[in-house]
């Protein structure tokens, strides 16, 4: 380890111990040296004994900085890893840190724009940041070319070495989990960290975020439900992104929305519709839709429109995942647990040798109590949570796209019910899901598939005679090869039969000769001839097996 990594490790250990997080170390024989070592660090006492463990963990992660904050946020969606009181605290982690010097941001912008001063590209650049988070910071300006208001997002300077050092330490912790926890191997901690690392590295590349925003904007062009600000790609690079500045009401400011005369019921329902449209129509969804990234337009409050920002994290589902997910939801709300179990096996989410009856019973045991509530109060996010947690007990592989989906659904559901507590999410989503499934099967789906494949077949049509001829020729060659193999197998079978026959005769002659040699010495050379003939027969039979 480098001196910098050693210093960072010392700071992390000191922070963990000052919040009493050594309580998380299980009391096992393998952890005894670790627990004894903790007692030797007597000058690092728990300074927050009055707070519960979950809150202490949250505060410690916030003190450790961006990597640990975002890691805690991701872990809050994996409720199979922690009890509820800890997972609930992790969900409260806020990605807010002190801003860095605006002059440094200005230097980074100038470096990204070829060394020219900021004034060559932008007017009214505000050295004071509009917002600051753990990964990046945002400043306002106007484009010199057309006078439009923009925001400039800049990656924090020197953050990459800190992220790499912290990730290395988190990987080491993850490798210890299977040794420390009886159920640690099933939780696949290294895969969890690998998934987190990918998400974090993606966030550090603002070109990727720019591309995501452009795609989402195109998907919802002219939509009455969602607006994505325009990105100016000519000004974007890995460390800098320039996009249209928007003005809206934060979705969490319910009082301001009501004061503006917003149709809260329609707004809540549109949030659900936006989510399911992204997932099932576009197969491309904004996976970081927490309240800080969602605004509502001031215009047309009777016909409200969301504004989405910060598209660094997106998710996608393939066609099979979408179908299985939609059918899972419908089967669950119809209480068809057998269908839910079969869908998990058919999709490959759980191993093919899973006992479907046991899996069905486990799902029923966990999920049936949910239906004690009125349907309008049932949480889609917690339905997914219960299903995935149960499936993990049956060795469900970690599905990163489903983890992102579950997190996003929990955000959307929370926002929707904050806006309109009577929101019946199932009533809003069911017609969409049923319509989508209907559209994927039957005659309309077949006609659409034929239309989609028509250009391919038109292109291949001139090659069809040659392809048929090649297939016939390969078929004849294949038949010839099969016949040849069959003849060789038959010949081997005959040789094996002859071999066994000669080996049997040889063994019989050798045994007979030995018996006569012992019991009838007066027979002279006869026993010797029998033994010699037996050895010859045995040798010939052995050669045929070679």
UniProtKB/Swiss-Prot annotation:
Enzyme class: transferase
GO cellular component assignments: plasma membrane
UniProt xrefs under Pfam families: ABC1
Chain positions recorded as ATP binding sites: 130-138, 153
Subcellular location(s) of the protein: Cell inner membrane
Primary subcellular site in the record, as a coarse category: membrane
GO molecular function, one term: ATP binding
BP GO annotations: regulation of ubiquinone biosynthetic process; ubiquinone biosynthetic process
Protein kinase domain segment(s): 124-502
Pathway: Cofactor biosynthesis; ubiquinone biosynthesis [regulation]
Ribonucleoprotein found in the keyword field: no
Recorded superkingdom: Bacteria
InterPro entries the record matches: ABC1_dom, Kinase-like_dom_sf, UbiB, UbiB_bact, UbiB_kinase
Membrane topology category: Multi-pass membrane protein
Biological function: Is probably a protein kinase regulator of UbiI activity which is involved in aerobic coenzyme Q (ubiquinone) biosynthesis.
Annotated family: Belongs to the ABC1 family. UbiB subfamily.
The protein, known as: Probable protein kinase UbiB
Organism: Escherichia fergusonii (strain ATCC 35469 / DSM 13698 / CCUG 18766 / IAM 14443 / JCM 21226 / LMG 7866 / NBRC 102419 / NCTC 12128 / CDC 0568-73)
Name of encoding gene: ubiB
């Amino acid at each position: 380890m480098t001196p910098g990594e050693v210093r960072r490790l010392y700071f992390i250990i000191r922070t963990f111990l000052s919040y009493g997080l050594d309580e998380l170390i299980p009391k096992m024989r393998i952890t005894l040296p670790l627990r004894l070592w903790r007692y030797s660090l007597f000058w690092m006492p728990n300074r927050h004994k009055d707070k519960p463990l979950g809150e202490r963990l949250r505060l410690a992660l916030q003190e450790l900085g961006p990597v640990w904050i975002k890691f805690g946020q991701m872990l809050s969606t994996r409720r199979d890893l922690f009890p509820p009181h800890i997972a609930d605290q992790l969900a409260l982690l806020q990605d807010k840190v002190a801003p860095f010097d605006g002059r440094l941001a200005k230097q980074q912008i100038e470096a990204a724009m070829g060394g020219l001063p900021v004034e060559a590209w932008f007017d009214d650049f505000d050295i004071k940041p509009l917002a600051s988070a753990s990964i990046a910071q945002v400043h306002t300006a106007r484009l010199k070319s057309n006078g439009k208001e923009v925001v400039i997002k800049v990656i924090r300077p020197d953050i990459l070495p800190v992220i790499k050092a912290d990730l290395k330490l988190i990987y080491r912790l993850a490798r210890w989990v299977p040794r420390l926890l009886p159920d640690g191997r099933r939780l696949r901690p290294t895969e969890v960290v690998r998934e987190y690392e990918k998400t974090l590295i993606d966030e550090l590349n603002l070109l990727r975020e720019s591309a995501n925003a452009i795609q989402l904007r195109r998907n919802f062009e002219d939509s009455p439900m969602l607006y994505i600000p325009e990105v100016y790609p000519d000004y974007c690079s890995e460390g800098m992104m320039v996009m249209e500045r928007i003005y809206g009401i934060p979705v969490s400011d319910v009082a301001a929305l009501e004061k503006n005369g917003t149709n809260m019921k329609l707004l809540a329902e549109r949030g659900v519709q936006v989510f399911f449209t992204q997932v099932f129509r576009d197969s491309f969804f904004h996976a970081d839709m927490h309240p800080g990234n969602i605004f509502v337009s001031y215009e047309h409050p009777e016909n409200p429109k969301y504004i989405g920002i910060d598209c660094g994290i997106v998710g996608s589902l393939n066609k099979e995942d979408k179908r299985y997910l939609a059918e899972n939801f419908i089967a669950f709300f119809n209480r068809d647990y057998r269908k839910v179990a079969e869908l998990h096996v058919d999709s490959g989410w759980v191993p093919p040798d899973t006992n479907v009856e046991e899996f069905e019973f486990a799902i029923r045991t966990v999920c049936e109590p949910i239906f004690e509530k009125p349907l309008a109060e049932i949480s889609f996010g917690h339905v997914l949570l219960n299903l995935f947690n149960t499936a993990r007990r049956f060795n469900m592989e970690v599905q990163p796209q489903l983890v992102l989906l579950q997190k996003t659904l929990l955000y959307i559901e929370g926002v929707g019910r904050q806006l309109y507590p009577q929101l019946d999410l199932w009533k809003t989503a069911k017609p969409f899901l049923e319509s989508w499934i209907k559209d994927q099967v039957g005659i309309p789906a077949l006609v659409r598939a034929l239309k989609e494949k028509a250009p391919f077949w038109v292109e291949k049509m001139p090659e069809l005679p040659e392809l048929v001829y090649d297939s016939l020729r390969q078929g004849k060659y294949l038949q010839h090869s099969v016949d040849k193999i069959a003849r060789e197998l038959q010949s081997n079978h005959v040789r094996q039969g002859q071999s066994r026959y000669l080996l049997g005769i040889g063994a019989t002659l050798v045994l007979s000769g030995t018996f006569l040699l012992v019991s009838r010495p007066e027979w002279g050379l006869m026993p010797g001839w029998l033994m010699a003939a037996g050895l010859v027969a045995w040798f010939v039979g052995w050669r045929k097996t070679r």
